[in-house]
Each structure stands twice: as structure tokens, then as C-alpha cells.
């Protein structure tokens, strides 16, 4: 077997609306394409031996062992690869469960789809699954050492991809409140919400965190001075820069015991406490100086007591933890080294921030701490005897936490909240040393030793003893107070034809409200009046530009087939989803071979509408109308006829619809009617001569109306939207030349040709078409373009795209010509493959009063060419 292609889906997609994080592998089964597992000698035995945990997979049997039963009875390798990829991730600590395997129209080629937690780990699991299967097929086995290495690699990928525990805690709380989030590339920053309603976090820093507060908190001596000036109890201390200043500094703080720590340190690095001799002080100075970027060392009076972390969020105390340094307790027989190994094997401990607790590491600092207690690594501790491995109680160095939130004295709460405000932090971790947190600091000689920006949440969320505290909730409350919205309205538009016009018209209607509208289309990404990026921008990457922009108040997103298949949607749900039509275009691409499969692709938009939103569906297109059964939100239809049975039934049920009736675009709900405007007064309809543009206007108007836009603003929007080259390039752009007219439209499929033809057929003069088609379409589709063109035009010029998408020069034109002749053997046509030359010929050949219709590859180039021709002919 070999992998032909791997892609990552990150939003609602063809395979699942709810399970949005999926790996899709295109797999060639090669020699085993016709061999189910029961026909491969030793395969079942080899698979069970290396992965016995597959017994937990139910598969379609709905009971434990169901999948292995299918392997024993005979199933194909694509299905087996799917289950192995899932199981490998499970074994590496990433819980997943969803998978699908489907054969494509090419025999032996399968799409294998499976869930992932972390993208790189998921892709790697897919590669390992194929390698494992190939090994069992050819040798009957897969090495245990190889599997161990694979799982180790997967765990490394998981660790490298995982967010920190504090960030993860905040994200889980956001998800519980249906707040969308996305990871920004800049320094592991996370965006919560969309557009103008977004907030950002980085670990436990937020976009509300003041830089002055962070700077002050990082300046430990400055923090202490500021707090002392405010009457807060802090340790006596001073800063030194050279070792020969140490003796004077010790005297200044009142002598031993003392604490030495780096001026700009963190996570307890370089700190030594309870120093009682000159030798200890000199050794501690070397440690602290080495841990400081500026070689600056704080010398402080040591205060006896327990180490506490007090967490203040948005001015309110939310949690208190007593922190105990990394330590081991003797059992009377084991050495300290053995006790450390035993402690590190506890399931709650992991490397770094991988788990609730961090494994205890042995280094110069820990050996020094042991030495000061009179211990070595080979010391056997008495039963119950405690050996500390760190002087500081940070969880990151192996410490543990005990929740003391309910025990802290009210005066200490007041002091902590005051400290956070004095330093200027919205989220502050305040380190308190006191013999008794239940008594006021001032009564027991307690002190504030540090204030930390970006404090860790792990000790509060998962203490070793005591109640876990949901400290993420007050963070979300602060970022989104009083249920402030995190989302912006998202209106998504899809279909085979008309997407760009409908998207731009809908965005134009929304701009009448005065809101900042961001939209994506086949011509570019737009924010308000300005284009951000030119080009075909109808995929999730482009949509992400809009959703990340902090100025955008409304997002209108054109969603094309390619992006949905390639990556899924950029959003997990939308407020309004518009499906215009489904026609035979792009068939044979991306394993979408039938129009029913294409309808499933387009239906992703309708199925992604949230429960309070609306799916706006074309009642005149049976494939679109059928999507209603899978919509979890509300449904509104549009139609070119009030007599459409779906419309009649929908209105009978008090549903909402937009209909073209008696020359008007009207909205119906139950028995009442609201007329938007007469079609001939809406420029995009070409004086009501372009039925497909009327349908687009109906869809856009209805989408705006169901989302609460006032009818007068909708009317104002459709009246002022002019389908010119500037407003809608390549969409029914009509140019009046001196003696004839030119129409440019980006129609490139049979349905598009028919739509433009409904307008062209009403033209009174000569009708000349400059036509072509994309090279990646099926032969029958290109021939159909020729057949339709012969019904529309008096004369045809066939040209080809510069990019024929894999076809030889001239083959596209030959197929179109075959279609023309098949429809009308006497049809008048020429082959002029170069687009520019073909257009120039058409402009010279058309009769006075005639119409030249251009279906271009380059919309911009064609428009510029016509505008120059117009100027030169005046």
C-alpha cells in the first residue's frame, strides 16, 4: 500500500459536521486491493499480537471485539488502517474515535478518514498505520521495538503541539460557553471569539493585561519597593551586582537567615532560601547570578513560613494554594534516588507541563539542597523522614499544591486584591510566605515575596490535596463581561453559480447598516471599502483573515467546493447559510464524481447553520431543497415562482420565503407579504432580463431579512448595487460600445452558460460568443458547453485558457467544437486559441447593434482590454 495524498480538515466538512478535526488520506491498496484480511496469511494473528488493545474497538458490531471479528472474517486494508491510526493515537494519550473509509471511483483507491487531536500527530499516526500494515502483510509481524519508538514519537509530537495547561484550562471554559477559538501563529497566542468581539490570551496574559503592570512584576526589586511604599508587608532586601557586595548586603537586611534569587528570574530558578552561612551564601550567589540575564542578585531577609500562591483575577481573589517543594518520604529501605524514581512513576507526573504534576529532576541545585540537609542520592531515609529536593515550591520543579482557598483570612484577601491593583495586573499570582494563612499577615510576620504576571493555573485546577478551583471561569467573565458576545454574524454563501454576486450583494446590503463588513469572494478579500488581497479567496484561509480582523462586525463568506473538500470550513457554525444551486461542474475532481456527491459538499454550509440561524435554500433546485432534512436551524426558501409546491407547503406552515411574483421581489411569511422592490429597478437583474440574477437578489435579500435587517435597508441595498466591472467584476458586466455592446461573465460550466443565455437570447441584434472551458472538466462537460453555446450564439469563437490544467493544447477547443457540431452541424464557429486574439477578432467581427459575450479566463485582463478598446473607438 502507499499513501497518495494526505490532507487535514479543520472545520465542518464533507465527512462530518460535528467532528471537525479529521485527517483524510488517499490510499492506494495496490497488491491487496482485492484481498480482504482473511485471505492474507497470518495477518490477523500479527495484528492482534502487536496491537491487542484493538479489542476495544466496537466498529459496526456495537460490542467489544467487533472490529477484530471483522478483521478475522475479512475486511479491506483501508478500513484496518483507519482503526490502527485511531488506536495509535489513543495509546499515545490522545483520545479519538471517529473514522470513515470509502472506496473512490478508481478501483483500489480509498479515502481513509480518521479523527485527530493534534494535526502533526494525526498525520504521523496515518503513516505509521500504513507502515505497520505493510509489515504484517509482507512478514507477518511488526517489531515491538518499532511500535515503542512510534508511540514515543507520537508522544513527543503531542507534547510539542499541546498548549500549556493554563491555556488549555481557559480554552475548555470557552468551549463550554460556545465561544469559538483559534490558535494564532504569533507566539502561541489564542484568539477567543471572532472579529470585533474577539479577545486574546497568551498563557494567562490577556489583551487587557497592561504592559506597565507586566514590566513592574518582572522587576522584582521595583515591585517590592512599590509595595513597601504602599504599606504592604514585604521582605527587607537589596540588589547586588558583584560577589564582593554580598557581605554588606547581608548586614543591610539584618543578617542570617537570608534568601538569594536572581533579579529577573522565574519558575524558582536560581533561588536559595534559609541561608545561614557565608559559604552557603557564596554558593547561592553563584546560582542566582547564573540564572539572571543581568547578573543581578536580590539579597533578602528570610521569613519562616509556608509558601502560598494567591491568584487574583480582575481584582478579586479566586484561589489560594499552599505549595510544598519537591520532596520524597522515606520508607526505611529505599535510597533517595530510588524514592525519586518511584515518585516520578506516579501517573499524575509527567515531563514539563504534560501532566498534573511535573517529574522531579536531579541537577546541581537539587544536589545542593540535599547536601544542606546532610543527604546524598544514595542515602536511605528512615520511615517517615522527608528529604527536600528543591528550596522553592514551584510545581514546575516537582512541587505539589494543597488548596487553601477557603482558609485564607479576610484581611489577607484584602491585601492580595490591593496588591494586584497596585502592580496593575488583571491576572496576578501573588507569592505569600506566612506561618498561618488563616491569620492576618501583619500578626504573624507574613510577607508578600513576589507578584507574577502570567501565573500558572495548574496548582489551582488540579491540586494534590483539596478542592479543584475553576479559575478559568473568572478569566472568561473578565474578557466577556455580562455575557458580552464573542461572535460576529457569519453569513456563508455556496452554490455552483452565482456565489460571488450574491456574496457581494449581501455584503453591500449589510453595509447599509453602518457596520464594518468583511467578505471573501473569487475576486478577493475585502474589509469595508478596501481590498485586502486580490485573487480567488473562497477557502478557509481567506475566511480566517476576516474572522481574525478586530474591526470586522459582520462576515459574509463565499465558500467554494475546493476549500470545503480541502480543509473544511473556517468556522464551526454560521448564522445564515445560503445554498444557491447545485449543477454538474467540477465533477471528477477530488473524488466527487456525481451531482449527488456535489450536493453533499454544498450541503455542508446548510448543515453548519446554528440552531438559532437560518438555512436559505433554493426551492427551485431539488438537490438544494432536499438539504432541509439535515438542517438543525430554521429554513427559509427562495423561488422564482410562488406556485412552487415547496413554497406553498412552507408558507402553509408559517414558514418564510422570498419569491419573484408579478415583477416584484417579495418576502412571504405565512399569510403576509412584504414587497422588497420591483425587479426592473434592481440593477443587478439587468432590467429584469436576467432571471438568474433575480434569483441571486432573492437569496441575498432573504438572507439579510432572516437575520433581522430592516426591509428599507434591504431595498436601499439592492437599488444601489450596480453590477459593473468595479462592483462585480466578471459578473454580467455590460459595456455599451460605439456600435455594439460587450458582455463579460465568468460563466465556465453548463449551468452558467444557460444562465447567461437566458439574458442573451433576448438580445435583438447579432450575438457572438467568445467561449472556452477549464481543462480539468470531463470530456462530456466540455462538449456540453459547445452544445449550449450553439443554442445561444449566431457565431462562436472558441479559445483556450493559458492553463489547460493538464490537457494538451487544442484538446479543449476540439471537444467544445464537437459539442457545437453535434447540436448544429451548420453552426458558424472559429478556433482562435489565444484569448486576447479571440476577443480582438470578436470585436471586429460583430455586426452593428450586436452583442459580444466573453467567457474569459482572465476577468481583469478582459475588462482592461474592453475599456481600452472603448476609449480608442471614441
From Swiss-Prot:
Protein name, entry field: Cyanophycin synthetase
Coiled-coil spans in chain: none
Keywords: ATP-binding, Ligase, Nucleotide-binding
Gene field: cphA
Domain ATP-grasp: start-end pairs: 224-480
Subunit structure, as described in the record: Homodimer.
One function term, GO molecular function aspect: metal ion binding
Listed Gene3D superfamilies: ATP-grasp fold, B domain, Mur ligase, C-terminal domain, Mur-like, catalytic domain
Taxonomic superkingdom: Bacteria
Species the sequence originates in: Geminocystis herdmanii (strain PCC 6308) (Synechocystis sp. (strain PCC 6308))
Keyword match Zinc: no
Catalytic activity: [L-4-(L-arginin-2-N-yl)aspartate](n) + L-aspartate + ATP = [L-4-(L-arginin-2-N-yl)aspartate](n)-L-aspartate + ADP + phosphate + H(+); [L-4-(L-arginin-2-N-yl)aspartate](n)-L-aspartate + L-arginine + ATP = [L-4-(L-arginin-2-N-yl)aspartate](n+1) + ADP + phosphate + H(+)
Record function comment: Catalyzes the ATP-dependent polymerization of arginine and aspartate to multi-L-arginyl-poly-L-aspartic acid (cyanophycin; a water-insoluble reserve polymer).
pH effect summary: Optimum pH is 8.2.
Keyword Ligase: yes
InterPro entries, per database record: ATP-grasp, ATP-grasp_RimK-type, Cya_phycin_syn, Cyanophycin_syn_N, Mur-like_cat_sf, Mur_ligase_C, Mur_ligase_C_dom_sf, Mur_ligase_cen
One GO term of the biological process aspect: biosynthetic process
Temperature dependence: Optimum temperature is 50 degrees Celsius.
PROSITE patterns: ATP_GRASP
Amino acid at each position: 500500500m502507499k499513501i497518495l495524498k494526505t490532507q487535514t480538515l479543520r472545520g465542518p466538512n464533507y465527512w462530518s459536521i460535528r467532528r471537525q478535526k479529521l485527517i483524510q488520506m488517499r490510499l492506494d491498496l495496490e497488491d491487496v486491493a482485492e484481498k480482504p484480511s482473511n485471505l492474507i496469511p497470518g495477518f490477523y494473528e500479527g495484528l492482534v499480537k502487536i496491537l491487542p488493545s484493538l479489542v476495544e474497538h466496537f466498529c459496526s458490531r456495537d460490542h467489544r471485539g467487533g472490529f477484530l471479528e471483522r478483521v478475522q472474517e475479512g475486511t479491506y486494508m483501508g478500513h484496518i488502517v483507519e482503526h490502527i491510526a485511531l488506536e495509535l493515537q489513543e495509546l499515545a494519550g490522545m483520545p479519538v474515535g471517529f473514522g470513515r473509509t470509502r472506496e473512490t471511483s478508481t478501483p483500489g483507491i480509498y479515502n481513509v478518514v480518521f479523527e485527530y487531536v493534534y494535526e502533526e500527530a494525526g498525520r504521523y499516526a496515518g503513516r505509521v498505520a500504513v507502515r505497520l500494515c505493510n509489515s504484517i502483510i509482507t512478514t507477518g509481524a511488526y517489531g515491538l521495538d518499532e511500535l515503542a519508538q512510534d508511540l514515543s514519537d507520537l508522544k513527543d509530537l503531542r507534547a510539542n503541539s499541546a498548549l500549556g495547561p493554563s491555556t488549555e484550562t481557559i480554552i475548555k471554559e470557552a468551549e463550554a460557553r460556545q465561544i469559538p477559538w483559534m490558535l494564532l501563529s504569533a507566539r502561541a497566542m489564542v484568539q477567543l471569539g471572532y472579529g470585533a468581539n474577539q479577545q486574546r490570551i497568551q498563557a494567562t496574559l490577556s489583551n487587557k493585561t497592561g504592559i506597565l503592570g507586566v514590566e513592574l512584576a518582572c522587576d522584582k526589586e521595583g515591585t517590592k519597593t512599590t509595595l513597601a511604599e504602599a504599606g504592604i508587608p514585604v521582605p527587607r532586601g537589596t540588589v547586588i551586582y558583584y560577589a564582593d557586595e554580598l557581605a554588606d548586603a547581608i548586614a543591610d537586611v539584618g543578617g542570617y537567615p537570608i534568601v538569594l534569587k536572581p533579579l529577573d528570574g522565574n519558575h524558582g530558578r536560581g533561588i536559595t532560601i534559609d541561608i545561614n552561612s557565608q559559604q552557603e551564601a557564596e554558593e547561592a550567589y553563584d546560582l542566582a547570578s547564573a540564572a539572571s540575564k543581568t547578573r543581578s542578585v536580590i539579597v533578602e531577609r528570610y521569613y519562616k513560613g509556608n509558601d502560598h500562591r494567591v491568584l487574583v483575577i480582575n481584582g478579586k481573589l479566586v484561589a489560594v494554594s499552599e505549595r510544598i517543594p519537591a520532596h520524597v518520604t522515606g520508607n526505611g529501605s529505599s535510597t533517595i534516588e530510588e524514592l525519586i524514581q518511584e515518585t516520578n512513576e506516579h501517573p499524575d507526573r509527567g515531563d514539563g507541563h504534560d501532566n498534573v504534576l511535573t517529574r522531579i529532576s536531579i541537577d546541581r541545585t537539587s544536589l545542593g539542597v540535599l547536601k544542606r540537609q546532610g543527604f546524598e542520592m544514595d542515602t536511605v531515609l528512615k520511615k517517615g523522614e522527608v528529604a527536600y529536593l528543591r528550596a522553592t515550591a514551584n510545581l514546575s520543579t516537582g512541587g505539589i499544591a494543597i488548596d487553601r482557598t477557603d482558609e485564607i483570612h479576610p484581611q489577607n484577601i484584602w491585601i492580595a486584591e490591593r496588591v494586584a491593583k497596585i502592580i496593575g495586573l488583571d491576572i496576578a499570582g501573588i507569592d505569600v510566605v506566612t506561618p498561618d494563612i488563616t491569620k492576618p499577615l501583619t500578626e504573624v510576620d507574613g510577607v508578600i515575596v513576589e507578584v507574577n504576571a502570567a501565573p500558572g493555573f495548574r496548582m489551582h485546577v488540579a491540586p494534590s490535596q483539596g478542592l479543584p478551583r475553576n479559575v478559568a471561569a473568572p478569566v472568561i467573565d473578565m474578557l466577556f463581561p455580562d455575557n458580552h458576545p464573542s461572535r460576529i454574524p457569519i453569513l456563508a454563501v455556496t452554490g455552483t453559480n452565482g456565489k460571488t454576486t450574491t456574496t457581494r450583494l449581501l455584503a453591500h446590503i449589510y453595509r447599509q447598516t453602518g457596520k464594518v463588513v468583511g467578505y471573501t469572494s473569487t475576486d478577493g478579500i475585502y474589509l469595508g471599502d478596501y481590498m485586502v488581497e486580490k485573487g480567488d479567496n473562497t477557502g478557509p484561509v481567506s475566511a480566517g483573515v476576516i474572522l481574525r480582523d478586530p474591526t470586522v462586525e459582520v462576515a459574509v463568506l463565499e465558500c467554494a467546493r475546493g476549500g470545503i473538500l480541502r480543509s473544511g470550513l473556517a468556522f464551526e457554525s454560521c448564522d445564515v447559510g445560503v445554498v444557491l444551486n447545485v449543477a454538474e461542474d467540477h465533477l471528477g475532481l477530488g473524488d466527487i464524481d456525481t451531482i449527488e456527491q456535489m450536493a453533499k459538499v454544498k450541503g455542508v454550509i446548510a448543515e453548519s447553520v446554528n440552531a438559532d440561524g437560518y438555512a436559505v435554500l433554493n426551492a427551485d433546485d431539488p438537490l438544494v431543497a432536499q438539504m432541509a432534512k439535515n438542517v438543525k436551524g430554521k429554513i427559509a426558501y427562495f423561488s422564482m415562482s410562488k406556485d412552487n409546491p415547496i413554497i406553498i407547503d412552507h408558507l402553509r406552515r408559517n414558514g418564510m420565503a422570498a419569491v419573484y411574483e408579478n415583477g416584484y421581489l417579495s418576502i412571504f411569511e405565512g399569510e403576509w407579504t412584504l414587497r422588497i422592490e420591483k425587479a426592473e429597478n434592481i440593477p443587478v437583474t439587468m432590467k429584469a432580463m436576467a432571471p438568474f440574477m433575480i434569483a441571486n437578489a432573492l437569496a441575498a435579500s432573504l438572507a439579510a431579512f432572516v437575520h433581522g435587517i430592516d426591509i428599507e435597508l434591504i431595498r436601499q441595498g439592492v437599488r444601489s448595487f450596480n453590477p459593473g466591472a468595479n462592483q462585480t467584476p466578471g459578473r454580467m458586466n455590460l459595456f455599451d460600445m460605439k456600435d455594439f455592446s460587450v458582455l463579460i461573465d465568468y460563466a465556465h460550466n453548463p449551468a452558467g452558460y444557460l444562465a447567461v443565455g437566458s439574458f442573451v437570447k433576448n438580445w435583438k441584434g447579432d450575438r457572438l460568443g467568445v467561449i472556452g472551458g477549464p481543462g480539468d472538466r470531463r470530456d462530456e462537460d466540455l462538449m456540453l458547453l459547445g452544445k449550449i453555446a450553439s443554442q445561444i450564439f449566431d457565431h462562436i469563437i472558441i479559445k483556450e485558457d493559458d492553463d489547460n490544467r493538464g490537457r494538451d493544447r487544442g484538446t479543449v477547443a476540439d471537444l467544445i467544437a464537437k459539442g457545437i457540431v453535434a447540436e448544429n452541424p451548420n453552426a458558424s464557429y472559429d478556433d482562435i486559441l489565444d484569448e486576447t486574439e479571440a476577443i480582438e477578432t470578436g470585436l471586429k467581427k460583430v455586426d452593428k447593434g450586436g452583442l459580444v459575450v466573453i467567457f474569459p479566463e482572465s476577468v481583469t485582463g478582459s475588462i482592461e482590454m474592453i475599456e481600452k478598446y472603448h476609449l480608442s473607438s471614441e
